């Protein structure tokens, strides 16, 4: 195959790969936030502690998306 066409195909596949890698953290953030709201409804006095834990969980989930983004830039060059 022509090297230019091969490079374009590789770039497009990497873009799709990053999109798929972002799905997992998106689902994870939704689950964490939903379960936190559910827990706050059950025990309102724990809301502050639950909120802090929720933000930590969201941060760890989003770290996966950032790793996926970094991987995209590493492998497309």
UniProtKB/Swiss-Prot annotation:
> Which residues of this protein are annotated with the site description Reversibly protonated during proton transport?
62
PANTHER family listed in its UniProt record: ATP SYNTHASE LIPID-BINDING PROTEIN, MITOCHONDRIAL, ATPASE PROTEIN 9
How is it placed in the membrane, per its record? Answer: Multi-pass membrane protein
Report keywords, A-Z: ATP synthesis, Cell membrane, CF(0), Hydrogen ion transport, Ion transport, Lipid-binding, Membrane, Transmembrane, Transmembrane helix, Transport
SUPFAM superfamilies listed in its UniProt record: F1F0 ATP synthase subunit C
Mind telling me which InterPro entries this protein's record contains?
ATP_synth_csu_bac/chlpt, ATP_synth_F0_csu, ATP_synth_F0_csu_DDCD_BS, ATP_synth_F0_csu_sf, ATPase_proteolipid_c-like_dom, F/V-ATP_Csub_sf
Q: Which family does it belong to?
A: Belongs to the ATPase C chain family.
Q: Do you know which Gene3D superfamilies this protein is assigned to?
A: F1F0 ATP synthase subunit C
- UniProt protein name: ATP synthase subunit c
Q: What functional role does this protein have?
A: F(1)F(0) ATP synthase produces ATP from ADP in the presence of a proton or sodium gradient. F-type ATPases consist of two structural domains, F(1) containing the extramembraneous catalytic core and F(0) containing the membrane proton channel, linked together by a central stalk and a peripheral stalk. During catalysis, ATP synthesis in the catalytic domain of F(1) is coupled via a rotary mechanism of the central stalk subunits to proton translocation. Key component of the F(0) channel; it plays a direct role in translocation across the membrane. A homomeric c-ring of between 10-14 subunits forms the central stalk rotor element with the F(1) delta and epsilon subunits.
Q: Which GO terms describe its cellular component?
A: plasma membrane; proton-transporting ATP synthase complex; proton-transporting two-sector ATPase complex, proton-transporting domain
Subcellular location(s) per record:
Cell membrane
What is the species of this protein? Clavibacter sepedonicus (Clavibacter michiganensis subsp. sepedonicus)
Q: Extract the NCBIfam families matched here.
A: ATP_synt_c, PRK07874.1
Coiled-coil annotation: which residues? none
Query: Where do the TM regions start and end?
Result: 13-33, 55-75
The molecular function terms in GO held by this entry are: lipid binding; proton-transporting ATP synthase activity, rotational mechanism
Subunit structure, as described in the record: F-type ATPases have 2 components, F(1) - the catalytic core - and F(0) - the membrane proton channel. F(1) has five subunits: alpha(3), beta(3), gamma(1), delta(1), epsilon(1). F(0) has three main subunits: a(1), b(2) and c(10-14). The alpha and beta chains form an alternating ring which encloses part of the gamma chain. F(1) is attached to F(0) by a central stalk formed by the gamma and epsilon chains, while a peripheral stalk is formed by the delta and b chains.
């Amino acid at each position: 195959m022509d090297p230019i066409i091969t490079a374009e195909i590789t770039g497009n596949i990497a873009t799709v790969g990053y999109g798929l890698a972002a799905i997992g953290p998106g689902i994870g953030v939704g689950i964490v936030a939903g379960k936190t709201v559910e827990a706050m409804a059950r025990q309102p006095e724990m809301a502050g502690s639950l909120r802090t834990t929720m933000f930590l969980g969201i941060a760890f989930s989003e770290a996966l998306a950032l790793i996926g983004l970094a991987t995209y830039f590493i492998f497309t060059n």
